[in-house]
Amino acid sequence: MRMIAFFFVLIFSVQFIQAQDAGVDIKVRLEGSSASSIEAFLDNTDRSFVANTNRVIEVRNVHEGQHTLTVFAEGYAPQSIMVNASAELPVPNYNVGLMEVTYDLTEVEVVEANRSSLGMKQLKYIEVDGLYAAKKNDIVVTDEMAANISTNNSRQVFSKVAGINVQETDAGGLQMGIGVRGLDPKRTTNFNTRQDGYDISADALGYPESYYTPPLEAVEQIELVRGAASLQYGTQFGGLLNFKMKRGSEEKALEVVSRQTVGSCNYLGSFNSIGGSAGEWNYYGYFQHKQGSGWRPNTNYISNGFYAQAGRKLGNKWTVDLAFTHNYYNSQQAGGLTDRQFEVNPNVSFRDRNWFRVNWNVANVTVNGQLTKNLTINSKTFVLSSSRAALGYLGSITRTDTGGTRDLILGEFNNIGNATRLVQRFNRNGNPGAIILGSRIYQGNTRNRQGKAEGFDGPDYAFLNPENLEGSDFTFPSRNAALFTEALIPLSACWYLTPGARLEHIITQSEGYYTEQNRHPITGELLSQNSFDASTNRERNILLMGIGFVWRCRTSVEVYANASQNYRAMNFSDIYVNNPNIIIAPGMQDEKGFTIDFGAKGKLLKEVVSFDASVFMMQYRNRIGETLTTIENQEGISRIVNYRDNIADALFVGVELVEEVDVTKWLFPNAEWQLTWFNNLALVDARYQNAEVNAFNGNRVENVPVVNYKSGVNFRNGRFASGVQFSWISDQITDASNAEFFPDATVGVIPSYQVLDATVSYSWKRLKLEGSVNNIADQIYFTRRAAGYPGPGIIPAQRRMVFMTLQVKI
């Protein structure tokens, strides 16, 4: 009830800022035959208008001045006209003649104008595969960002996305770790992570960590939708993170792009892609190789990956796309440090036998079709067959690795799924609307094994006793079926309503055995060992509901609000984990809650300022977290461990503001160069409530910087482009007790840090030269305390790194 009351207070507060502008009517007359579907889009906005039964498009509430209106009709070429809105003149009428042509559905979908500002855009209200009105969303256009994309530098790539918290784990960008609104950034686990709309994480329900990140050199854009994405995409409080891959050139039969990068710490990156179109076919593929090391010892890595995609048009209304992704990398893990070791010399490493390997394979088939003039279908069927292996000494960083056998943890993931969506477009009094109906069927099977491996120094990923493991052997089957619907309902020319609901049926199981070993806390001597069989079976139905509103009477500004329920299934690591630093509580429950957004976005001062400002509240119930506790083994010896359980509820409230000033348009409107200045600020307060341990009430939630600030300047002049950005992240805590120090450094404070990055580029004909310097001031800091791999302990971030890239495009 409190959620509903708070939400409607926000909605009705919009009434105080309503205003009306001049209306414009536009008559569209077609030459030859008549078209039954006519739609128009207004420049520099995402507003669209549908013709009524008399084939008249009424554009209402446009601010005064000249605008470009682009008209589309099925079977006809697009036509753009200039229209003039003035409160002092009668409502103007325009006639537009359209010429008949042949084109396909996908061409219509991508033409609509987006609000864009140097690498940033917004999703359209109605996309081919979903509805995004009334949702906080961002599109990052990778080729337009001043960023080091060879190493997937998240700090630069997401510099204009509010509240992104980056966790650094390796120098080559092998894994991406980002979180929003105070959610844990480890391997992007709190996002529903996808590539071209299909799953790429280990297991969407029980193991949502992303061990594979698409190379940003092959990514056209990155789409982010906050918590309200739960209705269309299911579990995860963070929302949707989708990497939209590039496609082959529509103008060439063959286009080749080769990018060669060298950098600090022996970095070598080679990215080579081909793409093009031939008849009804479009294709794209790449091969990428990366190798190098971090600035610490024992951090060597090598990575190889390739991607192949082919699409074919089946007439004018259907397309079929096939894609396959492979990624392999092997990296040495330097291990963690204690607080004292980090202070004395963060360059050291006390682990030289720890390794990590990933072998990722994903295949997908996508079918897009137009069933009727206003009804489209999008269906994706994907298969994932992948593995990851962690090898090394798992003991506390306070213990010396004296050799001997190592621990090997091997995870194997085999998943298959289908997601199908129907989008029905309609118009109500000349205003566009749509209803989406979707389904998802998913089956996953994860096998996780842990045991002893050879005591060599190299990456020998083989168990000594595969039939009788010393640690554990579990299979985790999971099944998921879901139905959802969401609608974009125009209430008037200004107001839009977006109700939705999702019904989930989830089954997660586990079956296997584990071995308990009791060791002396000081000497590590094995005192006793026992094996136990274990199994679980959890079946549940989850109903998620949500509603949103959009108000947009002025074309340059819109106000949005939404409230949606969220859900996060227990991970497999919440069922069982064999790690001497972590104890799992029996009987843990799934996490539930809701998210509320209220914000405004658009352009001000004659489009000099672009902005997106919002406030949010996220209620997290049964939050799973870790606390320090003392346990006693069978021999009566006590030790302190991290205890994982449903520890409390949590309330997150925050403010997010991103603004960018076009200095050139403001001060030098006739200049050919462009200078922009952006600021990105997120303020988040996250506190525990209703905790079983009273001392936790009011404590800060883990991995939540209260202040997350980024600012930067971007400059472009012809072939030259550059960007400089500054990041400042306030301190974070890492457990629910808010402990500031622990001897093995698995919990404690992550101090505030500041980082400066810069990128420049120069293009000449077919060549492009890029240079990046990350962490210009050579700051010493860290973003993670790990309880297991790649630690345990403090994982230092990268020091100053310099990169140079030469690109050839033929």
Which residues does each predicted region cover?
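C-terminal beta-signal and adjacent terminal beta-strands/loops
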Residues: 626, 664, 674-675, 728-740, ...
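Gram-negative outer-membrane beta-barrel transporters
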Residues: 422, 429, 493, 614-621, ...
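Short acidic/polar hinge/loop motifs at secondary-structure boundaries
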Residues: 198-226
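Transmembrane beta-barrel wall of Gram-negative outer-membrane proteins
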Residues: 23, 262-291, 296-332, 355-375, ...
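Face-selective signature of the C-terminal outer-membrane beta-barrel domain
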Residues: 317-327, 358-517, 615, 659
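Extracytoplasmic beta-strand/coil segments of soluble accessory domains associated
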Residues: 138-140, 149-202
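Membrane-embedded beta-barrel scaffold of Gram-negative outer-membrane proteins
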Residues: 368-370, 376-392, 552, 558-564, ...
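Structural signature of Gram-negative outer-membrane beta-barrels, strongest in the C-terminal barrel
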Residues: 315, 431-442, 474-619, 659, ...
